[in-house]
Amino acid sequence: MNVLAIGAHFDDIELGCGGALSKHVADGDNVYAYVATRSGFKNCQNIVVRSNETAAKEGEKAMDILGVELIKGRFNTLEVEFTDNLNLEILKIVEEKNIGLVYLHWMGDIHHDHQAVARASLHSCRHVPRQLMYRSNWYQSNLEFRGNFYIDITDFWEKKKKSIEAHESEMERTGRKWIDFFYNEAKNAGQRIGVDKAEVYEVVKWLV
């Protein structure tokens, strides 16, 4: 099976579905990750917090850990819009790689870039038979994430963790919050289905 994960920034995919992707690789699937933005950003004082070069280097390392082929977009962080440029870039990958399963941002995510990429993903992947939405942060939304599809990542948590830790610049900025949060999420999801750790998704479509 050919699998595509779509994220707005370097780190979104690792946080949201890194365990599942690592499992797909172990199962022999062809796994690709498309990251829409160059992912560098500045703070409100216009000081660079993370450069595009640093983000790309860390993203490449993270995908190497997961064993995933990385496809890099060229959009600027916080400037992503639901436009034909983005739609066509995703559609080209879907058609060239003959994608059968796509992981995409949750539509209820309040992050501007995440919303735009989620909409573009749904539009461009409308003919992909299996689609799962993931959460890559803990931001509150007025919408409910309806997690109804679980993947056992017990044997793949360490790879997911290492792929997150590959984003050293972000780890320096946030400390261990990411690791702690997603570890707890994985443990809680695992308890619901009787395994040690799991990732949970909202199904858009699942053709059998």
Task: Report residues per predicted region.
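Short glycine/serine/threonine-enriched helix-capping/active-site loop
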Residues: 34-36, 73, 104, 134
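Metal-dependent de-N-acetylase/amidase catalytic core
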Residues: 1-4, 23, 27, 46, ...
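Glycine-rich phosphate-binding loop and adjoining beta1-alpha1-beta2 segment
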Residues: 41-68
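Hydrophobic anchor at the start of a short beta-strand
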Residues: 31, 70, 131
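ATP-dependent adenylation/pyrophosphate-handling site
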Residues: 2-10, 14-49
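A conserved beta-strand->alpha-helix junction
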Residues: 36, 64-76
